[in-house]
Amino acid sequence: SRLTGVVADVRLLPGGGAMPVHHSQFFRPWRSDGAPRIQAQSCLGKGASEAQSCASALCVAVERYAAAWQGDEAMLLARAAELPAPAITPDMLSFFSAEQRASARPGERAAQRAYDPQTPQAWTPAWSLTENALRYLPLAACYADAPAPWADFAGWSSNGCASGNCREEAILQGLLEVIERDAVAIWWYNMISRPQARCAAAAQARAAQALGPD
């Protein structure tokens, strides 16, 4: 609310050692369709100091709150060809093949449905920083817990979402997170062996602090 703000709680977790970790909590906004949901959401933040860790946990909570779908977001319901500006279509964001969709087994996380250009979608207006122009994105790719049928074709992910003290800082944080997740995914999902990082070889004190004595 306007009185209590977005973040309900921020506290330092015990046992953080050289890298302090803060826990934050926020209450997700009520959906306009009245659908039930778990209201309390937890986040974590880390840093080289307690102040950095606290700020990180605070910003993550604000980021996740802002990403929650409420039902009052700006949107257009149309086919991509009918939009007043180019669209980033669901098939440009999700790279599932027909074979992957056909081979899904019961209990596995389902892939999004194949995008049909003739099916109207819910689109969110966005500003492209690379093109410096208006673009439209699938609403379900921009907000967490967007309802069906829009979420059948696209899904939200926190990867690349970031908040900051200014627009430039938020952009940098989001870019670095995408680079980080992409680098990890390359070796993790391909099960590629990688050498261990040795603390003694760390070039900076902060890297050594993050790695720890072991």
Language model feature labels by segment:
Residues 1-214:
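Helix-coil modules at protein/domain termini and other flexible surface or pore-lining loops
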